[in-house]
């Protein structure tokens, strides 16, 4: 098979790097793998030192499995400084019928406004939330080219640091790899997982990563809110380390033990899930598990409260029975297995779900995103369309 028959996705996380190669002919995954690797994407301290060898190993393993050289990838990534911008832009049509060129014009104007005021950022996703024709709201392009005085588009842009992007590009070039597309990992994952909960009208996804957490809220298939905060599972590890007076490595071991236990999180169950005798002795000497629970719960509370800050759920959620809260990400595992109870805090949801992710489900989200023409998404990043103008890059949105 030729290179064009395969598509490669790398999910570049702060604690793990995942790779998956998809066979376009059969539309299925051909090979996937992952390796642990600590990287820092903070603008003040970008550290990709450990990842070069890991990426090289993952690429080489993948190439051996598929028998073809890989020279470009779709890069899935989240960073603590990634953010979204909501913008509303209007055009006076003077009672004329709307057409695609009017919409394209407004999209171009909006993109230019965002770019001019955020010159150090790269727009990686553009989502049209609403089409407003005078006082009528539409969530898809109105059929029949109706007449109106004013056409308004409400648009969400997800932006990424140019500095980090350029460093990632140079970093991958050292392995002779170019970036085909840059994708916000937490956004496209929630977009894909959203389809698994179709019986619910309102779906709230909280993805707790290593150094960041993200929030995505959907009204059926429509994204209505996206946000990222610079707090994640590693902050829980550091809290445990400070309170217990042990290394972060030992703290991470305790946290992983809690992730795996089915027992109730209390002093009585201490022997059941802490197998490391060194850590167990330190716990006996320094702190009770009940206090440890409070430390962890305090940080989890902070992550959740900051994620859900300024959201009026009483107006957002009008029917509890049709709402679900879904936790994803490595950092959310500590909430599962009866370790910590959150039901009382989120009693306006009918159900809470701890979605078990894997390399295949994560990278499949990227593949599905590239293959499906999501109704609200405008693709302005594709490298394959680099020579075309902005309007041409919207062809799939209007066809």
Report residues per predicted region.
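Nucleotide/phosphate-binding catalytic cleft detector across ATP-hydrolyzing
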Residues: 1-16, 20, 24-72, 77-203, ...
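Short acidic, Gly/Ser-rich segments with clustered Asp/Glu that frequently serve as metal-coordination loops
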Residues: 15-16, 210-214
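Conserved blade-register residue in beta-propeller folds
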Residues: 21, 215-217
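Phosphate/oxyanion-binding active-site loops and adjacent basic polyanion-contact surfaces
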Residues: 47-54, 296-303, 362
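Phosphate-binding glycine-rich/basic clefts of nucleotide- and phosphate-handling proteins
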Residues: 64-68, 80, 157, 165, ...
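Conserved mixed alpha/beta catalytic, RNA-binding, or beta-rich assembly cores of soluble enzyme
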Residues: 195, 202, 206, 215, ...
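ATP-binding/phosphotransfer module of carbohydrate and carboxylate kinases, centering on a glycine-rich
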Residues: 309-326, 333-351
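Conserved phosphate-binding/catalytic loops in two-lobed NTP-binding clefts
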Residues: 341-369
């Amino acid at each position: 098979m030729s290179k064009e028959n395969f598509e490669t996705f790398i999910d570049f996380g702060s604690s793990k790097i995942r790779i998956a190669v998809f066979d376009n002919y059969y539309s299925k995954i051909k090979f996937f793998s992952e390796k642990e690797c600590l990287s820092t994407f903070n603008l003040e301290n970008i550290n990709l030192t450990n990842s070069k060898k890991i990426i090289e190993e993952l690429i080489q393993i993948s190439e051996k499995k598929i028998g073809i050289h890989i020279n470009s990838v779709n890069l899935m990534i989240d960073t603590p400084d990634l953010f979204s911008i909501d913008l509303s832009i209007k055009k006076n049509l003077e009672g004329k019928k709307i057409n695609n060129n009017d919409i394209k014009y407004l999209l171009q104007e909006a993109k230019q406004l965002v770019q001019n005021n955020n010159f150090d950022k790269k727009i990686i996703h553009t989502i049209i939330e609403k089409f407003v024709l005078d006082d009528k709201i539409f969530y898809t392009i109105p059929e029949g080219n109706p007449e109106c005085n004013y056409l308004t588009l409400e648009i969400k842009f997800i932006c990424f640091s140019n500095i980090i992007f350029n460093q990632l590009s140079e970093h991958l070039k050292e392995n002779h790899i170019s970036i085909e597309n840059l994708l916000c990992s937490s956004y496209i994952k929630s977009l894909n997982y959203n389809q698994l909960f179709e019986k619910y009208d309102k779906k709230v996804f909280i993805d707790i990563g290593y150094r960041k957490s993200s929030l995505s809220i959907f009204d059926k298939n429509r994204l209505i809110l996206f946000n990222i905060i610079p707090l994640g599972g590693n902050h829980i590890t550091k809290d445990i380390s400070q309170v217990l007076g042990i290394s972060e490595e030992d703290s991470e071991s305790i946290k992983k033990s809690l992730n795996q236990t089915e027992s109730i999180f209390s002093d009585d169950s201490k022997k059941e899930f802490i197998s490391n005798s060194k850590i167990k002795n330190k716990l006996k000497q320094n702190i009770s598990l009940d206090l440890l629970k409070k430390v962890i719960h305090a940080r989890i509370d902070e992550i959740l409260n900051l994620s859900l800050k300024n959201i009026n759920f009483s107006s957002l959620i009008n029917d509890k029975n049709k709402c679900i809260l879904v936790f994803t990400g490595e950092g959310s595992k500590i909430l599962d297995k009866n370790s910590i109870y959150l039901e009382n805090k989120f009693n306006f949801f009918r159900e809470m779900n701890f979605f078990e992710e894997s390399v295949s489900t994560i990278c499949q989200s990227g593949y599905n995103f590239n293959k499906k023409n999501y109704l609200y998404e405008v693709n302005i990043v594709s490298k394959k369309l680099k020579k075309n103008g902005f309007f041409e890059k919207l062809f799939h949105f209007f066809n």
